[in-house]
């Protein structure tokens, strides 16, 4: 019986060739569009999900008010992270990223390469974010000044091999020791760094709540209601720096063009 159904269907297709071609082409285009949209949505929703603790990682943003105008900034002040960890038991860890929109001149042989995918980060960076190491211990890699963590492709680019542990790179005429090599950052991440330098090498004298220079991330303890936490800390911190702060969950927000 099924065989007869196929025969009838085939005869109808042959009988109405033009109509059949239009229908089949339309169906194929519709399916292709559906698959492309589905893949795009899945990719967007996967941003930063590679982090083991993605559901508990948040970025501290500042809503700065100047007169009647309000500015939403993806940065916060120098002491923000340390203050939150000290004053709020809900905060398990924090880390700061500095200079993500800058660049450094990296020496390679006799030439200098202007690298834009660079930043400075606290030693706690790898306690918050999951970036697998190929060599070295990322938990301690940025504990000292003049240290840097690089990606696998960067190691091969500068040294011809991923085995770059202990080697020296010169950035802006300052030597840095490579203390860890990590896998290249996934495409579905709002981080796109090739060099992560120690925060100890950042020459800043800010130390107040009005200097918005850092991207601050916090790792909340399991079971924390971040909405109530955000409301509480906004009231307290806002009295110190005259701004309103908010936390953005980096497990669910895609930050385009951050780095």
For the regions a language model picked out, list residue spans one by one:
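Mid-to-C-terminal secondary-structure elements
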Residues: 119-134, 146-259
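Short aromatic/hydrophobic contact patches that present stacked aromatics
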Residues: 26, 59, 215-217
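N-terminal Sec/SRP start-transfer signal
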Residues: 1-31
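Short amphipathic beta-strand/extended segments in non-transmembrane regions
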Residues: 58-62, 77-134, 240-241
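Alpha-helical transmembrane segments
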Residues: 29-58
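Generic recognition of well-ordered alpha-helical segments
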Residues: 4, 8, 15, 78-82, ...
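Glycine-centered tight turns that cap/initiate beta-strands
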Residues: 18, 89-93, 163
